Amino acid sequence: FGYLADDADNIRMLRRAFESVQPGGRFALDFLNVPQIFRSFRGHEVTQRAGLTLTRDTRLDLARGLMHKRWQIDPGGIVRDTTVRAYQPHELVRLAEQAGFTDVALVGSIRGEPLELDSRRCILLARRP
């Protein structure tokens, strides 16, 4: 979810998730906490692990709400480009409700901690009526 730039595609994914949950069943979506990412944004990041160097360059498209990322793994020169929709928490709630979910809530961790600006994740919890 979120790796498609078009809202219609992402809402279609949520509707399919809704259809797969039994009535009364619960649904969880683990997503980026976009406010935290924007707050600590670094466009260029290099990580070294197990003899590999992973370079990530990220460009923000604030007008469209997208993060364009280029990943490079060396040695090997593997390059991959990805685009992630930078949904704000309130947008996730709106999309889940449009898909038919109710009792939508947001938490900041799998332990159920409150969603805050510094939370690393934004986890949406919802129910199919």
Identify the role of each PLM range.
Residues 1, 80-83, 111:
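Conserved short-loop catalytic and cofactor-binding motifs
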Residues 7, 28-95:
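SAM-dependent methyltransferase
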Residues 87-129:
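C-terminal lobe and adjacent flexible extensions of AdoMet/dcAdoMet transferase-like proteins
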Residues 2, 24-25, 108:
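Glycine-centered flexibility sites
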Residues 1-9:
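A short SAM/SAH-binding and catalytic strip from SAM-dependent methyltransferases
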Residues 11-26:
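A short glycine-rich, Lys/Arg-flanked "PGG" loop and its adjoining helix->strand segment in the class I
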Residues 27-28, 103:
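A short hydrophobic/small-residue beta-strand
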